[in-house]
UniProtKB/Swiss-Prot annotation:
Gene3D superfamilies: Phosphorylase Kinase, domain 1 (3.30.200.20), Transferase(Phosphotransferase) domain 1 (1.10.510.10). The keyword Transferase applies. Residues 388-400 have a biased composition (Basic and acidic residues). It catalyses: L-seryl-[protein] + ATP = O-phospho-L-seryl-[protein] + ADP + H(+); L-threonyl-[protein] + ATP = O-phospho-L-threonyl-[protein] + ADP + H(+). It comes from the Eukaryota. It comes from Rattus norvegicus (Rat). This is Serine/threonine-protein kinase DCLK1. GO terms for molecular function: ATP binding; protein kinase activity; protein serine kinase activity; protein serine/threonine kinase activity.
Length: 433
């Protein structure tokens, strides 16, 4: 049985009012060598895609000056002087997302507007999310471009990723191989490595939060979004949260956890990328069965679904899904593995037939537009994540079934020279997906 509890947010300092400095815009370079590049068991965005409104055009007559929104709030002139604000393209429980174009560059972004009246008493949760977004700057992470805080609203100019999500990329392609899956993991592991170098744990890595960025040369890369559950790791964490299919055993066991819960989630995603269904599956809506499987950590590669998948891929998945946290791979080790750095990929590439199984198992369907997934991720806030925070009512044998007690998480030294101001593009030893 599960009961809902509130996220243990860490109150931070008040948001700057306003912040006039602008973070560097995402690099428009299109590297030809980039790697491909509610609480249901599988989860999804808290914002319903079916209700997302998509704007195909903007009013060309819009000029600088304070604008009144259809939702009844005034968009500050500080925003409208720099951005042409368009129609509402997403409407979540606590935030509205509007199309916006930077006037000086014609670059398209998304303006996320959080109405403070809906957040009373829980402001610290929003502050924690924004404080994380301020710190992160990486090619494989959805960026916060600029922010402005006024008494009644918080305005966030966000990078708008328009290529759909990870499942969209797989189900819409005509050819899909291990090399494609390897490239996707390269992008994800690069983002995780960077976050962990800052001692930030994401805690909700799943396909719906991995968005496809399409470069001008036709290559693609993944960007990780939705930092509503992200937090700084300065000691063991105990809040039981996440999306059940991707949650690590140490979270369920409530023994304390750290950064490597993100590696477990990435391992589950890698498994899905290669066969179309997750390694741990419950029966119907019985999450206890799913959690018991996760606690046991027995990973199988059933025939015929895995017959044409390389042993190198299976070995890597096993190392990412180790119940023993000390033995589980880090993001650095994932990136160094032959299957990811190209040495372990098979020469004869078999096409993987996973799209149909993904559609069936995850009940994925067509979205209103390719932008819908990116808008949905932006529309989600930390407050929406309260549904994904749960406490397991321990049975007497929970810890007994959890065979490997994790060591207290250490402050990680998986550093990479990506400062928050870096706009370097992650390059891969492989072809793009």
């Amino acid at each position: 049985m599960l009961e809902l509890i509130e996220v243990n947010g860490t109150p931070g300092s008040q948001l700057s009012t306003p912040r006039s400095g602008k973070s560097p815009s995402p690099s428009p370079t299109s590297p030809g060598s980039l790697r491909k590049q509610r609480i249901s068991q599988h989860g999804g965005s808290s914002t319903s895609l079916s209700s997302t409104k998509v704007c195909s055009s903007m009013d060309e007559n819009d000029g600088p000056g304070e604008e009144e929104s259809d939702e009844g709030f005034q968009i500050p002139a500080t925003i409208t002087e720099r951005y042409k604000v368009g129609r509402t393209i997403g409407d979540g429980n606590f935030a509205v997302v509007k199309e916006c174009i930077e006037r000086s560059t014609a670059r398209e972004y998304a303006l996320k507007i959080i109405k403070k009246s809906k957040c009373r008493g829980k402001e610290h949760m929003i502050q924690n999310e924004v404080s994380i977004l301020r710190r992160v700057k990486h090619p494989n992470i959805v960026l916060l471009i600029e922010e402005m805080d006024v008494p009644t609203e918080l305005y966030l100019v966000m990078e708008l990723v328009k290529g759909g999500d990870l499942f969209d990329a797989i189900t819409s392609t005509s050819k899909y191989t291990e090399r494609d899956a390897s490239g996707m993991l390269y992008n994800l592991a690069s983002a995780i490595k960077y976050l962990h170098s800052l001692n930030i744990v994401h805690r909700d890595i799943k396909p719906e939060n991995l968005l496809v960025y399409e470069h001008q040369d036709g290559s693609k890369s993944l960007k990780l979004g939705d930092f509503g559950l992200a937090t700084i790791v300065d000691g063991p964490l105990y809040t039981v949260c996440g999306t059940p299919t991707y949650v690590a055993p140490e979270i369920i066991a409530e023994t304390g956890y750290g950064l490597k819960v993100d590696i477990w989630a990435a391992g589950v995603i890698t498994y899905i990328l290669l066969c179309g269904f997750p390694p741990f599956r419950g029966s119907g809506d019985d999450q206890e069965v799913l959690f018991d499987q996760i606690l046991m950590g027995q990973v199988d590669f059933p025939s015929p679904y895995w017959d044409n998948v390389s042993d190198s891929a299976k070995e890597l998945i096993n190392m990412m899904l180790l119940v023993n946290v000390d033995q589980r791979f880090s993001a650095v080790q994932v990136l160094e593995h032959p299957w990811v750095n190209d040495d372990g990929l098979p020469e004869n590439e078999h096409q993987l037939s996973v799209a149909g199984k993904i559609k069936k198992h995850f009940n994925t369907g067509p979205k209103p537009s390719s932008t819908a997934a990116g808008v949905s991720v932006i529309a989600t806030t930390a407050l929406d994540k309260e549904r994904q925070v749960f406490r397991r009512r321990r049975n007497q044998d929970v810890r007994g079934r959890y065979k490997a007690q994790p060591a207290p998480p250490e402050l990680n030294s998986e550093s990479e020279d990506y400062s928050p101001s870096s706009s370097e593009t992650v390059r891969s030893p492989n072809s793009p997906f």
